[in-house]
């Protein structure tokens, strides 16, 4: 090795060490602060959820909660806020995620859950984490490239604190931005921040999201064929969910210009549907129904009604997330299909959860890791088969309109197009 080569090697090593320590520091800051925010947010969501169950009349306050949400967004000049799409765009094109988005989405999501809106929490976590990550980047005076990494780092930390799946949380933040491209420069800070955040959540008594799959069938040709057929249905459900969510939102905005009237109507519709269908199963995130779907088979209409309730809620302007409702749709569809195909209910619910999640996010690696963190390694032969097929067959639909499809799902081809 000559002197010039040695000098270059030393310079690269020096840069790597400096970069490592920089991101170690940032990961600890993000993991501790954003993880704490996420954990407290999780505790607050649990509290307002229990209040809603204890006091069913709170459902009638949903239109009022909607008015408050619209007012808050207007007063801080975030009326046109695009939610998670804004965070994704910020990483793609250096847009800013204002710090005020974090408290705004937290309060709005709490109001939505308190009064029975059908919404999740992880979409809110991505926005909170992204906004706080962007704030730290400004505080540290980072350039545009490092700001992107800090946003992803924040997303990983908050998602991990709320969901308790640190590896999937870290990978999701890097994978969801552009389909076919992984932002590996963010790997170290995202992984470290996610583990720190999950540790803080555990210290506060929050348990990781985990489901027990009691029975595993043999991975035979016949059973494999059954799961292939189910995967087609999971992919179709993914497409339907995206179409319903986006279509409902468009209907609201096309026919009701006033956001206050729009959200009041949405709240009234949720109240009406609760009494029309005679159940509270579709209010809130629906975690209890997901857990139940692993034990007993669900009716055929359960996943469809959750789609409807969620679309009416989020499309009208209420806040929260789409991910837990997505898992609800997948789990209950898989649970319904299990007896039809003569397969274990829990295993089919597990495959449905991660397959529909993959179909609407276009994140197969995250989906596979999520399956291992939530169900254990015993299910992975079945889940990876369903995930792969759902990814292929769900086309270019996505929960997030700003998500870029960089590489084709069907050929080794650069296409760089927006999702549906």
Q: Can you name each region flagged by the protein language model?
A:
Residues 1-420:
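Alpha-helical transmembrane segments and immediately membrane-proximal extracytoplasmic
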